[in-house]
Amino acid sequence: MTTLQEIFTYFAKFPQKAGVLELFNRSASDHFPVYASLKTQITALDPHSLIPGIKSYVFGIDEQSIKKRIEEISGTYLFVDYGNINSREDNLKRRTDEILIALTVATPLHINTLDMVEQVLLADQALDYLLQIMAIMRQDSRCSPFVKQLTFPVEITPFLARELSDSTGWTMVVKKSGISLL
């Protein structure tokens, strides 16, 4: 399994399964033979829906696809973004690779109808979901080779994206690092 498929699959266990399966528009792909097996793997994912309050899954870096997906969502979503791949080589010619993974739990407001107290409560709920994800990841670090390669955040930041249906929530960034990951 490639690095991005591994990231996609691991974090797919947190939102409701139906919200993850919405990302698959086909039963198979003419361009990518692994598509059908990835869909089967996600369908059979166990455990799944670990945080039932997170209804949808958004994954990727393409701004237009992300924007379109979030416009279709009502309720809280988990948005997984990735990037900034770095490779370094030490004196012994061992290559260490790192990739940043941003996890955002947010809710699109579509039309800002919440008062300031409701906004605080919504932000509190998103932060709670993100902290639940982090707690599960820490538990998984004992047995999951994928999670063992993650460094946990020292900073969790507020997320407000007007261009994403006025989504509001919280983001944490983790780093996956290891010898010859890529």
Locate the predicted segments by residue.
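Short acidic, gly/pro-rich beta-turn/loop elements at beta-sheet edges
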Residues: D90, T113, L182
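Acidic-leaning, charged glycine-interspersed low-complexity segments
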Residues: V120-S177
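Oligomerization/assembly interface segments of phage tail-like spikes and tubes
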Residues: R95-H110, S165-S180
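Short, solvent-exposed beta-strand/turn "edge" segments of beta-rich domains on protein surfaces
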Residues: I70, R88-T96, A161-S167
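Small/polar-rich, solvent-exposed N-terminal microdomains that initiate assembly or binding
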Residues: M1-N91
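Extracellular/virion structural assembly segments
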Residues: K93-E98, A106-I136
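Residue-level detector of alpha-helix boundaries and kinks
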Residues: R88, D115-E118, F159
